[in-house]
Amino acid sequence: MPLTRRSFSKFAIGAALVPAPAIWTSARAQAQPIKLGCSLSLTGPLSSVKAGLVGYEFWRDDLNAAGGILGRPVELVVYDDQSSAAGIPAIYSKLIDVDKVDLLFSPYGANLTAVIMPMIKQRNKFIMGMFGISNNDEVKHDKFFQIAPWGPKASSDWCRGFFDIAKAQSIKKIAILAADAEFSKAAAAGGEKIIKEYGFELVLNQTYPPSTQDFSGILRNLKAAAPDAVFVCSYPPDSTALLRSVTEIGVGDSVKLFGGAMVGPQYASLLENLGSSLNGVVNFHTYVPEPTLRSAGIEKFLARYAPVAKERGIDALGHYIPPFYHAAGEVVAAAAKGANSLDETKIGEWLHKNPVDTIVGRITFDAMGDWTERRVLMVQFQGVANRNIDQFRTAGKQVVIDPPALKSGDFIPFAKARG
């Protein structure tokens, strides 16, 4: 049966439990599985995030091989949300009331997560947030924990690194281009706050429909405003269209810094398709293979991920989403073991008080469930060639400019970086 919201056909990734290792007793082997539930964008415009499923699966398989959580195996219950918020409340109601899952992962991103947060708070459920921005700012749910490294005060500060670069380059005038969508609007609003804080002049603040493919008129407005920097808040389809338009039309000679909050240039398919159109762009990321970021945990994960990605035809690199989806599982397991319970209140209380070591590093959560330390990367694309995905597996193509502690190279002004 196809995966649709209407049928709620369960994606068969966890129904068959991993065989119990020999060290399990028969009582343990017969224990009821602990169910972790979520929706995932397996189809639709956000389907690149389905690579995160591999992160969940690796975590589940390794955990079950080691004895599970509290002596019980872990099962994943995942539904396709088709990249649409419309069916997500019904999916999560089903996960809670019909599937009786023990703990939840959110959908991907701010747009899809926003529609369930009131229900999650009302039902008092524990949930791991998967890359949304500011989803807990209004709800203030004490059992929400964000796996992305946005840091505290994420609504404004998650992209602060972009503006720190602007400040270092003596930027004076900034323009904002933002899609009319939850994530992009939140990012733009955060950018406005920092622009005001840093004393920059906001010369253009333009919102456009997320379906926009022709950016010629917007780029004409941009050139007329003559900004020194352009802060872009976009999702994959409009990120692609905008960068192609920039290559064809340009942004004007005044622009030294371009990018910031573009979702899309983290994914292998867009990197390969856009190629040299990316040069000079400075944009957020969570992991790139620069020497300042390499670690044994990430290296091992990516080596294991590569053949699976090739077999399934998913994101070839797996840098952005998959390691953090694995880490989300690690956080849940550590909290349940630390609390010695599946009681959601106890798990939440434990996480607010204790750090968790994961393949993406040590994570400590604040009162809002965000990381206590911002670890968002601002990377600049430099010397990128066309149609060569392997170049992104090596250092030097996505150079870390910010934060300073992880810097791996020097910033190059936009026009110069584009040759």
PLM ranges: what are they?
Residues 279, 352-419:
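Solvent-exposed, acidic/polar segments of extracytosolic/periplasmic ligand-binding ectodomains
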Residues 101-205, 256-283:
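Extracytoplasmic ligand/sensor domains, especially the bilobed periplasmic-binding protein
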Residues 7-26:
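N-terminal export signals
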Residues 48-54, 69-139, 208-215, 240:
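Beta-alpha junction/loop-to-helix N-cap segments that form part of ligand/metal-binding clefts
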Residues 246-326, 392-396, 407-418:
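Extracellular/periplasmic periplasmic-binding protein-like sensory domains
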Residues 46-70, 190-194:
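Short, polar/charged alpha-helical segment
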Residues 22-40:
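C-terminal segment of N-terminal export signals and the immediately downstream linker at the start
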Residues 37-57, 79-86, 108-109, 177-186, ...:
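Extracytoplasmic "Venus flytrap"
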